[in-house]
Amino acid sequence: MTDVPATFTQAECNGDKPPENGQQTITKISEELTDVDSPLPHYRVEPSLEGALTKGSQEERRKLQGNMLLNSSMEDKMLKENPEEKLFIVHKAITDLSLQETSADEMTFREGHQWEKIPLSGSNQEIRRQKERITEQPLKEEEDEDRKNKGHQAAEIEWLGFRKPSQADMLHSKHDEEQKVWDEEIDDDDDDNCNNDEDEVRVIEFKKKHEEVSQFKEEGDASEDSPLSSASSQAVTPDEQPTLGKKSDISRNAYSRYNTISYRKIRKGNTKQRIDEFESMMHL
């Protein structure tokens, strides 16, 4: 309440009673002032939710920090006393840190900071569009460069007046060349085989004639020697025996060689004429 200055008369100051009118005016003024100064109807104003949440979050953080300090001190003591429980304590510390992080995230979400972290959907779409444009630009440039290179190559071909051989044409030409070389080699082998067969047949025929002549000579020599001749003449010297053995060995070797060579030629796939020649030689 405020003190209201009042004007008093001289009689009041001297101790005499003031007049009644003066008292009435003073009382009226005081009542009006009291009415003016009286407070308006009081409404209880509750604190905002944000203020309460911030206070609660600060208190929870302080409690968490205090708990962490206590836990760290207890863990140090436990490590000094029981070093075997290190693994369990480390696991517990990791869980405490994870819980602390989750609680902090929840508090920031409650306080309303989540709108700063989470961008709007429109901004996300704009960012994606910008990224797509950035990625599409180099692709378009590469396609344009490829088209330009192809156009330059076509112009060069037209100007030169010929077409560059492709990989398929090169492969076909190589294959044709290999086939020609292979055919030529086969023809050469066939010619060589024919010549070799003819030479071998001639050699064998010459050897057979030589063997027949040698046999006739031996028979003539045997007929000239009479049975009444001396034992010395009838006895065969040891030098003559190996010569006879050598001649027979030569004939056998030649015949076996002919058989093996002709059989080998037949196995290679020669003509029917060669087979007939071989059969005729076998019957001789």
Curated annotation (Swiss-Prot):
The keyword Glycoprotein does not apply. Residues 126-140, 171-183, 201-220 have a biased composition (Basic and acidic residues). GO terms for molecular function: actin filament binding. Coiled coil: none annotated. One of its GO terms (cellular component) is cytoskeleton. Keywords: Actin-binding, Cytoplasm, Cytoskeleton, Phosphoprotein. Residues 184-200 have a biased composition (Acidic residues). It is found in: Cytoplasm, Cytoskeleton. It holds the Pfam family Ermin. The keyword Cell division does not apply. The modification Phosphothreonine is found at T237. It comes from the Eukaryota. Disulfide bonds: none annotated. Residues 265-284 are annotated as: Binds actin. The modification Phosphoserine is found at S73, S214, S226, S230, S233. One of its GO terms (biological process) is regulation of cell shape. Residues 225-235 have a biased composition (Low complexity). Highly expressed in adult and fetal brain. Expressed at intermediate levels in the lung and liver. Residues 1-23, 110-251 are annotated as: Disordered. Plays a role in cytoskeletal rearrangements during the late wrapping and/or compaction phases of myelinogenesis as well as in maintenance and stability of myelin sheath in the adult. May play an important role in late-stage oligodendroglia maturation, myelin/Ranvier node formation during CNS development, and in the maintenance and plasticity of related structures in the mature CNS. Binds actin. PANTHER family: ERMIN (PTHR47137:SF1). This is Ermin.
